[in-house]
């Protein structure tokens, strides 16, 4: 096993993604929102839109890109978890703009790809 746990490595890349998105002008709202259904890594606001962010990282693309790691099951969990977060914030998914983005990180953080509207609810 390596020097760092999977969670520590995940936190490191989430921090990198958070800093990257803040530099892009997004306003940070929440991190590691956890429910029985699932977890959302980062939550931001861009203008009037709430942005739920899944952070994925890969050492290399040998087994696919980081963005390809977001499965259909994961997408469903993200949507349900986002609805819970919105409800706790007294916001309705029916009258607020929101989207799901992926920040894909490769090459130990030297390559960051921000994919907006990466996940659909369908």
UniProtKB/Swiss-Prot annotation:
Source domain of life: Bacteria
A GO MF label: nucleic acid binding
HAMAP family recorded: UPF0102
PANTHER family: UPF0102 PROTEIN YRAN
NCBIfam families found in the cross-reference section: PRK12497.1-3, YraN family protein
Entry's family note: Belongs to the UPF0102 family.
Full protein name: UPF0102 protein VIBHAR_00890
Species, as recorded: Vibrio campbellii (strain ATCC BAA-1116)
